[in-house]
Amino acid sequence: MKQFAASAAPKSLSREDIQSYGINGYLVLPNLINEDKLIPILNECMAAWHREKDEYNPKATWLKNSLLPDIHHRSSLVRCYYFDGPLVDVAQQLIGPNIKGATSQLTFKMRGNIKPFGWHQDNGYGQLEPTNAISTLTALDNADEENGCLWLIPGSHKGGQVDVSDRLSAQAKLAEKDLSIEIDNDKSAIPIPLNAGDAVVLHCHLLHRSEGNMSTTRDRRILFLRYADADAVEVYNGNQPRLGPLLRGVSRFGEVTEYERELFDG
């Protein structure tokens, strides 16, 4: 697999960056991808999106309107970025030497999609142990309050996992049960505006949400990539190993070591 060349590689975090992440539960990485690399990625993402998605339908579900999973199966440039880009360097510094990919998807709020997405933790959608997985959101557009940028509560990861297990049954998933969390006081919440090419890294327990896209002229397109310890297991699945491509280091699970190995030559 060809290496991904970003604006700076490998991506090294400062001591202050790591301390800030520990305190606040998030880290903004400005200009992680320069424009020359970003535009081809966006083009491949949009080609994949238009192959599988219709125009925004206000009567459709969030999954149908806003999410395209396994984008690394549909875009070779995303695959290179996911498997060998600067976010893997970041994951090693925040998680440890042994890293696997846990999720790749497009999370889009196209113009006209004014539906908000409530407070939640990403570990609530797929609880992993150890609880040091990170979610990364790379902005494919400029994102601000008008077009639905992320909001988060700094330091909220320290509260640990909020139990939403009653909404994780097979029946609940089929019904697309809401996993949002009621927050008594969100006055400490802050918006996280991003420029295209920036990324934000979130601890798996950090509370975050987004408002609808109120812009009539701009989309808010995000490349969402999740990384975990190579030995992370799915708590909701009898502590079976989370399957994902082994990107750095080693795993004690053979099925992780072999997972999607055929993609590394493509």
What function would you assign to each model-found segment?
Residues 87, 111-113, 142-145, 158, ...:
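Short, charged/polar surface micro-motifs in flexible loops or helix N-caps
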Residues 3, 43, 51-59, 199-201, ...:
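Non-heme Fe(II)/2-oxoglutarate
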Residues 62, 127-132, 215-219:
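A generic structural micro-feature
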Residues 1-24, 29-128, 165, 247-256:
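Non-heme Fe(II)-dependent double-stranded beta-helix
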Residues 120, 127-145, 193-196, 201, ...:
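Short, conserved beta-strand element in jelly-roll/cupin
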Residues 117-123, 138, 175, 185:
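Active-site glycine-rich loop that binds ribose-phosphate moieties when present
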Residues 145-209:
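Double-stranded beta-helix
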Residues 34-35, 107-109, 143, 157-158, ...:
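Short, solvent-exposed loop/turn segments at secondary-structure junctions
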